[in-house]
Amino acid sequence: MKALHFGAGNIGRGFIGKLLADAGIQLTFADVNQVVLDALNARHSYQVHVVGENEQVDTVSGVNAVSSIGDDVVDLIAHVDLITTAVGPVVLERIAPAIAKGLVKRKAQGVDAPLNIIACENMVRGTTQLKGHVMNALADGDKAWVEQHVGFVDSAVDRIVPPSASATNDPLEVTVETFSEWIVDKTQFKGTLPNIPGMELTDNLMAFVERKLFTLNTGHAITAYLGKLAGHQTIRDAILDESIRAVVKGAMEESGAVLIKRYGFDADKHAAYIQKILGRFENPYLKDDVERVGRQPLRKLSAGDRLIKPLLGTLEYGLPHVNLVKGIAAAMHFRSDEDPQAQELAALITEKGPQAALAQISGLDANSDVVAEAVNAYNATK
């Protein structure tokens, strides 16, 4: 089996690429970073530090790399069995034209074997969005062939892969946590379902997408925002602060009540899932900076993301949300010289005040009780 993976960054190398290579799949990375491409093609291998209670160093080998903006990547798309991505949500649109060209070439060469494409991004139904971009780049005469032969498979991914400075200045070395979860929608595949250790197949993907978004992502963000306000540097430092931990755990329990109501998750199992995530935040081997986790607050405060979406669920079912509101208020306080969205957020609050600013960013009604609660919490944490 041959696979092409877009994105040779830390998540690409340390998570999805590693799982594919470990499964014996012939893997080629596509990226724009020439330093990383040259290193991969010189060595065809790299090291992954898996850190937890038992640290281990795994070697991923037998890999190649091509530029994601050249002809080589188009040629590969005509022949591979699987395409995966870990490029970040905003980059999906940029790689779509190359994928479209490759699919046209595949059709022209008479390659009718099924191809499946899986976007492994921190977003809801990312592959469906990628499919829209690819279809927009195709001529009408090619669309029916693509619909028939190409599966666009949505997935949920979960592994903390912070940026880490290599002790040896190796551009390929990457550090990851022990935990990983890659859940894919088995109803969207074309052809035979793949058997890849570490890939879990489900016919109820949205339950797992929201479980991850409402728990890991919600908890991670609130830990970062409260941690930044309290002067902590890392996620571990923040979650070991009992006052922060109480709000984070409370927020995950509030969002969890929505999941239990919506999808029928077992309450005891979900409580154990929350405890596992708190343990991941405490991992002493991951230097996860609150500034990194908190960045892009406008996106994280938008209607479909990790803070507002679970809040909307509590409103839908008439459930408590006091800790989620505290997290939203902390996000509104996020300031960073390195993050344009943090600066835009600050300017918006200065210009319009917290009430109108939150309503504009989140889509919530400016005159609603919940916006008033968030503004009160925001003012109380000044």
Curated annotation (Swiss-Prot):
Gene3D superfamilies: N-(1-d-carboxylethyl)-l-norvaline Dehydrogenase, domain 2, NAD(P)-binding Rossmann-like Domain. It catalyses: D-mannitol 1-phosphate + NAD(+) = beta-D-fructose 6-phosphate + NADH + H(+). SUPFAM superfamilies: 6-phosphogluconate dehydrogenase C-terminal domain-like, NAD(P)-binding Rossmann-fold domains. Keywords: NAD, Oxidoreductase. GO terms for biological process: mannitol catabolic process. Its EC number is 1.1.1.17. Pfam families: Mannitol_dh, Mannitol_dh_C. One of its GO terms (cellular component) is cytosol. GO terms for molecular function: mannitol-1-phosphate 5-dehydrogenase activity. NAD(+) binds at residues 3-14. It comes from the Bacteria. Belongs to the mannitol dehydrogenase family. This is Mannitol-1-phosphate 5-dehydrogenase. It comes from Salmonella agona (strain SL483). The gene is mtlD.
